[in-house]
């Protein structure tokens, strides 16, 4: 794959005390049943925070108060190249409703590494579990 520019994606690190919201990809999706943070592709010309708010409404039916950038990575999967910008979310309005995932859980921070996360997210997961991020 020789893509010069990565696909821009934004994802939320939703924090509730010592718990982090994690989402399991639907079994029929690419990388099915692996865990990730909610979010999605940024549209051309779209602000990162606006994109994440839109994705969280679509995926979880919440209106998020999107905060600061906490981590950024680039990762080359066999079939695509992505740049993921992770933004903190410490509050939201509405009741969480799983609209697209196999499962959604509030995971205790220390337990995060026990989930089978997407390869690209694993270093971030370790850093969150150690309390280095958010």
For the regions a language model picked out, list residue spans one by one.
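The catalytic Nudix box helix
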Residues: 37-69, 108
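Short coil/turn segments
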Residues: 25-28, 62, 117
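Conserved N-terminal beta-strand and adjoining loop/helix that marks the start
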Residues: 1-21, 41
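C-terminal structural segments of small proteins and small subunits
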Residues: 93-94, 109-122
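Charged phosphate-binding loop/patch that engages nucleotide di/tri-phosphates or the phosphate backbone
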Residues: 120-134
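A conserved beta-turn-beta hairpin within the catalytic core of GNAT-like acetyltransferases
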Residues: 29-34
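Active-site-adjacent beta-strand/loop module that shapes the phosphate/pyrophosphate-binding cleft
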Residues: 63, 73-96, 103-106, 128
